Amino acid sequence: MPTAQLLLLACLLWGLEARTAQLRKANDRSGRCQYIFSVASPNESSCPEQGQAMSAIQDLQRDLESTKARLSSLEGLLHQLTLGQAAGPSESQEGLHRELGTLRKEREQLETQARELEVAYSNLLRDKSALEEEKRRLGEENEDLAQRLEHSSQEVARLRRGQCPQAHSSSQDVPAGSREVSKWNVETVNFQELKSELTEVPASRILKESPSGHPRNEEGDSGCGELVWVGEPLTLRTAETITGKYGVWMRDPKPTYPHTRETTWRIDTVGTDIRQVFEYELASQFLQGYPSKVHVLPRPLESTGAVVYRGSLYFQGAGSGTVVRYELTAETVKAEREIPGAGYHGQFPYSWGGYTDIDLAVDETGLWVIYSTQEAKGAIVLSKLNPETLELEQTWETNIRKQSVANAFVICGHLYTISSYSSPDATVNFAYDTGTGRSRVLSIPFKNRYKYSSMIDYNPLEKKLFAWDNFNMVTYDIRLSKM
């Protein structure tokens, strides 16, 4: 009983403290008195059912498992940290330094690439500006060329109305093969390629006249002597297309009908199949660049060694050591002759090259051929040719190496050579006398005004040197001593 009282007293005190306890008294079924007290749950508003309690327990278990997992993770981290501290701080610092160095290198590489891209972009902008400027300049040049072309077309039309009809009247005598080539139209591509920049030179300066009104040096007046002086070059015209960089132009020192001393022939020698020979009946037509006729050779020629003499064109056949005689009026080949042992196609050229192995020349005494052979070991060989049959009448072997000189020509039976094809201040450096068989050193100034003389020939009728200097057709006055 005292125990029950104490229990009751404790419950009362706890109930008073909790302020939610309730005490009630009642008889049970047997009539015994029972004391019953209740206390409110501090967390739950109502008593959970059995299923809810199980769910709560499962939630607690999951929380506990999660807590255990986190605790295990923390223990693992603590273990790793402990191992790292045991290994010493230096290794960790070194690893960090290495990683930091790698990152710095990558940053420097990225910065370098950025700078290079900026420079490339700047260069592109500059190139773009330069291209735009070039485009503008080319547009202006195109407009200027169009104006010049229009002016040239008008000039051609004017000349056709005035000066050129006589060229058509003579075409009846031309064979059919050449008649087709001789029909020039201002709109054709061939005609446009023949356009040239003209240098106005009075005809009186080209064909100097004596007081009687006739040109000097008529046939029978040999005027022979040794070369002592060469004047400044006089430019007659300039070829416009690339085919005119090298070439040969000539007049016949002994013209035959229907050609005159004014008739001029021109050949552009850039190319592999050189067959066209442009004929200009008048000196004015040559200066203006309007051919009166175009010959098409039956076989191609090679290099710049051709000459015209007594109505025939003499030239070296391409890829051979053969000299060909082509009669200009009949437009047929009259003779061919292989020069014995002569080098060709680059074996013994002049110093500028150009397959100038065989070079023909004309002087007061007739027709010559300049070449070399294996037997002569590259020295110049000079032979006199029969102009009809091309037989060698006489031959001289000199001691002048052909590849050491730029060009050669013959005056009054004397062979003269030029020291350089490109130097503005070249010289006539050697002379060989066929009369004595001796050579001598000279130092006569010779001007290569345009620095690429590919052809130099002597015209005994006009007493001038004709030359082709880097697209330009020029002449040189000369002075000969008295024999």
Swiss-Prot record:
Cysteine pairs bridged by disulfides in the record: C224-C412
Record GO cellular component, one term: cytoplasmic vesicle
Tissue expression as described in the entry: Expressed in optic nerve head, ciliary body and retina.
Highest taxon in the source lineage: Eukaryota
Post-translational modification summary for this protein: N-glycosylated.
Coiled coil regions, renumbered to chain: 51-162
One Pfam family named in its UniProt record: OLF
InterPro entries reported for this sequence: Olfac-like_dom, Olfactomedin-like_domain
Compartment(s): Secreted; Golgi apparatus; Cytoplasmic vesicle; Secreted, Extracellular space
Motif (Microbody targeting signal): 481-483
Signal peptide (residue range): 1-18
Positions of the Olfactomedin-like domain: 223-482
GO MF annotations, alphabetized: fibronectin binding; frizzled binding; metal ion binding; myosin light chain binding; receptor tyrosine kinase binding
Residue segments, region Disordered: 153-179
Residues annotated as binding Ca(2+): D359, N407, A408, I456, D457
GO biological process: bone development; clustering of voltage-gated sodium channels; ERBB2-ERBB3 signaling pathway; myelination in peripheral nervous system; negative regulation of cell-matrix adhesion; negative regulation of Rho protein signal transduction; negative regulation of stress fiber assembly; neuron projection development
Keyword Signal listed: yes
Function: Secreted glycoprotein regulating the activation of different signaling pathways in adjacent cells to control different processes including cell adhesion, cell-matrix adhesion, cytoskeleton organization and cell migration. Promotes substrate adhesion, spreading and formation of focal contacts. Negatively regulates cell-matrix adhesion and stress fiber assembly through Rho protein signal transduction. Modulates the organization of actin cytoskeleton by stimulating the formation of stress fibers through interactions with components of Wnt signaling pathways.
PANTHER family recorded: MYOCILIN, OLFACTOMEDIN-RELATED
Subunit structure: Homodimer (via N-terminus). Can also form higher oligomers. Interacts with OLFM3, FN1, NRCAM, GLDN and NFASC. Interacts (via N-terminus) with MYL2. Interacts with SFRP1, FRZB, FZD7, FZD10, FZD1 and WIF1; regulates Wnt signaling. Interacts with SNTA1; regulates muscle hypertrophy. Interacts with ERBB2 and ERBB3; activates ERBB2-ERBB3 signaling pathway. Interacts with SNCG; affects its secretion and its aggregation.
Protein name in UniProt: Myocilin
Gene coding for it: MYOC
